[in-house]
Amino acid sequence: QTFVAGAFIVLLLAAMYRLRGVNAEEKKLRPVLLAVLIAATALRIGLAATNTGYETDINCFTAWGQIAANVGPANFYSEGFCDYPPGYLYVLGLQGLIGNLLNLTPGSAAYLVLLKLPAIASDAAICYLLYRMGCRAGKPSWALLAAAAWAMMPAALLDSAMWGQIDSVLALLILLVLDA
């Protein structure tokens, strides 16, 4: 739980840091965007803690994270079943290490939040990126509307916070490329 709170604070500080140096209309919208980010992230954390998710994937993510944490990435694919490429397994391995360090019980609310945290953080980053991209197009109020729509879109809430899917991680990477 401490890790979740710390990650949430870091995410908020990063968002606030990126919001500096903007025009007058954007400056007026900052508190609203921050409120949207806080509300959306808090809602996702609450949903993540209270929903088991898509059990097959959650169980696989848990097992793969613990295996990666115990045997390391070099020996991960030597035994057992895994249908994920190596990239995200580094994230799962880190989650397994954190879960072990914090003595979290797999399946507990805290462990569920830990597993879903990369997707939740990606959702928040997508929200901010949509806002930033819209502001660059010269439409801060429309940018805020797009960010808020993403933040509270039921499909995004269901996918990341409730089911524990990581589609938003890839979506974030695609948006970062488009924003570059």
Model-derived features with residue positions:
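Specific aromatic-rich, kink-prone transmembrane helix
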Residues: 129-132, 169-180
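Short helix- or helix-capping micro-motifs
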Residues: 40, 146-151
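Extracytosolic helix-loop segments that constitute the early lumenal/periplasmic catalytic or substrate-binding loops
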Residues: 57-87, 94-105
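Catalytic cores of eukaryotic secretory-pathway lumenal/extracellular enzymes that build
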Residues: 78, 85, 116, 129, ...
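Short acidic/glycine- and proline-prone juxtamembrane loop motifs at membrane-interface regions
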Residues: 161-167
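Transmembrane-helix motifs of polytopic, lipid-linked glycan transferases
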Residues: 113-138
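Start-transfer (signal-anchor) and selected internal transmembrane alpha helices
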Residues: 1-46, 135, 143
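Membrane-embedded alpha-helical segments of multi-pass membrane proteins
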Residues: 2-11, 117-125, 168-173
